[in-house]
C-alpha cells in the first residue's frame, strides 16, 4: 500500500520553518563535537531546506513493536519507582564507611584494647610507611600470577594514576580479573585509607579470627610470599572481614577460595524497566525512497600552511544540493508515543526479505535493484553502501581554474564533511538508535 505525502504542507509555514531550524541546529551541534583534521579549523551549519520533491512511501508490513521501544526512560512520568521489581540503588561508599564507624562507636572498649589510642569519632591513624617497611624483609622476585600484598607497592607517583598504585593488591589482582566484577566501590580505598585496615597489621577488628580464617603473621619468608598455597592472601582475609562487617562483595577477591559467605548482590546489570504491552500497540514498516533537492549549507575554515603552518584560514562554503535515499523506516505507536527509526540494509533484508523479492523502480534516477543474475550482486553492494546515496555537493572558494578549485585541500574537506554527515545520520537514526515523539 502506497502513501501520498503533502510535502509542501508538512515543510512550509511556521511549523516547517521551525522544524528546519531544529534540524540545522542539531546537525551543527553534532559537528561541534567532532574532532576535526589538522587542515580544518571549524565547521558551521548555516541553513537547511527540505526542498520541493517529496519522498515516496510504501507500507511493507504491520507487526508488533520492537522490544526496545517498550523500555522505560529514567524520567518517565508513567513509571512508578514503588512498583514491584524496581531495581534498588546499591549503597554508596559513604554509607559503607558509616557502618564501620557506627560499630566502632558501639564497641569502644573492645577496639581500644586491641588498637593504640582512642578512636572516638575519628579514624585510627595508620602506621607510618617506615615502620611497615622495617618490619618486612627483602623479598625475591614475586610471581605476578598470585595475589599481591598492597604494602609491596610504595606510594610513588605513577603517571596518570593519582596517589600511586598502592591499592593494586587489594582489589585488582594481576592474575586475571573477571569482566563481570568491577571494583568501582573500592577505588577510593587503599591500605592507608580509613574504614579498612590491613589485617596483617591490626587483625580482625570486628571479630577474632575463626579457625577457618588463619591469621597472617607479620613476617614472612621468601617462600611464604611467593607461594600462594603456604599462606592466605590479603584479599582472602579482607574477604572474610568484608563479608562479616559490610557484606560488600565488590571488595572481595574474585578468585577467593572462601565460599562460606555467598554474594548478597547480583553482578549482572539491573533488569530493564519495560512498558506493559497492550493490544492497540502498532508498528508499521515502510519502504522509503527519496531522490530530491534537499539542501544543507555548511561553512568550513580551511587552514593554509604556507608560508608557515596554519598561516591563514579561508572560508569554504559547501552546499549539499540533493541526495538519494533508499531504506526501510519503522514507525511504532505505543501509549501516546511514536518511535521512529530506520533499519540497516542487513536488518531490512532479514525482516522483509532480500531485494529480489521486493518491487523496485519507485523513483526515476534510481537504478532498480534485483532481477536476473545481477540481483545478488546488487543486493551485496547495497549491504556495503550507506542509506544516504549519491550526495551531491557544490563548493565555493576563491578563484577557479578549469572548473576546479585552486586549493588542494578542498577535496579532502568535501570528503570529510560527507563522511561526517553520513555518520551522524547512521548513529542517530538507524536502529538500535531511534527517536521518540509525544503525541
UniProtKB/Swiss-Prot annotation:
PROSITE patterns: SMP
MF GO annotations: lipid binding
Membrane topology: Peripheral membrane protein
Compositional bias of kind Polar residues: 230-255
CDD domains: SMP_Mdm12
GO CC terms: endoplasmic reticulum membrane; ERMES complex
InterPro entries according to UniProt: Mdm12 (IPR027532), MMM1_dom (IPR019411), SMP_LBD (IPR031468)
Principal localisation: mitochondrion
Claim: Methyltransferase is one of the keywords in the record: no
The organism's place on the tree of life at top rank: Eukaryota
GO biological process: mitochondrial genome maintenance; mitochondrion-endoplasmic reticulum membrane tethering; phospholipid transport; protein insertion into mitochondrial outer membrane
Presence of keyword Glycoprotein: no
Biased amino acid composition, Acidic residues: 71-84
Pfam family membership, one: MMM1
Annotated signal peptide: none
Domain comment, as recorded: The SMP-LTD domain is a barrel-like domain that can bind various types of glycerophospholipids in its interior and mediate their transfer between two adjacent bilayers.
Quaternary structure annotation from Swiss-Prot or TrEMBL: Component of the ER-mitochondria encounter structure (ERMES) or MDM complex, composed of MMM1, MDM10, MDM12 and MDM34. A MMM1 homodimer associates with one molecule of MDM12 on each side in a pairwise head-to-tail manner, and the SMP-LTD domains of MMM1 and MDM12 generate a continuous hydrophobic tunnel for phospholipid trafficking.
HAMAP family, A to Z: Mdm12
Protein name according to UniProt: Mitochondrial distribution and morphology protein 12
